[in-house]
Amino acid sequence: SEFFRNYPIQIDYSKQKITIYQSIQDVKKIQKFQSNFLEISPESKPFTSIDFMHQLTYTNQKMLIDIGNSDGLWLFDNQIGNLKPLQNVFSDELGKGFSGSINGKRGVISSSNLGKYKLKLPLIAVPDDKSIQYLNIKNNRKGSIGNEILRRFTIILDYKNQLFYCRPNRDFKDVFHYNRSGLTIIHDQFEWRNKKAEIQFNQNNSNQKNYSTSHHINYKFKLKPIYKIEAVRKNSNAGLVGLKENDRLMKLDGKQVNKMSLDDIENFISTQDVSYLKK
């Protein structure tokens, strides 16, 4: 946190690149970024404000900038007040907290604005009051901005000058998506897998004529990841086809998952139908 206080940090989501600057003046084309006020809490957590539309207009809603949150927005119903029911709503496990699972609802609102940039029909999450009763919500915080919104921008956190900069990237107009399958996949452990290679040996016979022969030998061992299902959302597609907790995931659309990263798997099940899943 002390490091963030001293140097502007740029996160380029589309290039998956983080750049640390000596000062904000060192950022090229900084004039193309929109700047917004950045409030820093005593715990060095960054906050900014957004507006959103959902039957009513909600302005200057203070949000934690949470780069560890994979959702778009978390809205705290008990802090906002008068939040209308979401569109296309369903219950889900939103994540894990110190006291266990964080449950709530996911759905759609009309739009949200990050500065002058308007995002249409963002998918959002509303945690149950019971799930966040031990969360220390203070300083008039209304929720969190997560990576499903942040990834559509290049952002700069300038703690020293208390400014948050953002500029849309090539993913800005992407349709918002969520994990359609209803599965929570985790990396469980590794296993050893061996490969075989064909090795050719040249040999001479007594008449000095060369001939060759081939043999298969085990030549390389590699650690391959094992993925399993940690949770299945109630009434989800995954549950309907019979997938269960602790099932081992073997293939996605015919492809061995031990050749994929966890990010690859999560991206796949967020955009594909559960019929591609096999256990």
Residue locations for each model-derived region?
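Pepsin/retropepsin-fold aspartyl endopeptidases
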Residues: S1-K279
